[in-house]
Amino acid sequence: MLTMREVTKDGFGAKVRDWNKTALIEQWRERWADHVNRALAERDIDARIDHRSLEAQGIALEPQDKIGPAASRIGGRGLEAERIEEHRAIAQRNGERIVANPALALDALTHQQATFTKRDLAAFVHRHSDGKEQFDAAYNAVRSSPDLITLGKDGRGQDRFTSRAMIETEQRLHRAADTMAQHTDHAV
């Protein structure tokens, strides 16, 4: 956390309004994402973060504010109650979208990591649905989707999954690499 006020020999001065500029905040978010993604790659962790909005990422879900444990506990009062209600309404709409089109969940999950577990899927669906009934419907819709590909067990014995679109992307990349390898006259 940073103060928005300039510190001088006389104490705190006026607020630095430059820090409120959207372009600067977006630049900070992009640099943070780059930093985190480098650290994840150095540790061979198959996950990435994206600083862009869901819309900019091509994910057709509504963004939701994070509702922390403290806000959830106090639940029925004032502004927090309004935020919680809006969060639930958005989660309900997102859950309906996932039930209608399970590929939305698969695309969002594989946008962050190439493969995922049942737990990753459950956490995603939980975050984007409202209540047990909708969670079950959305989770089952994704699990029964023909676009969900089971890869097998990982080193921890957990089932790993990906999407048909991710497999197709990897196959296109493999074919492109093979084509490039066959040509000796390309410049690098």
Set out the residue ranges of the language-model regions:
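Single-stranded nucleic-acid nicking/binding segments centered on His-rich, glycine/basic loops
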Residues: 3-174, 184-187
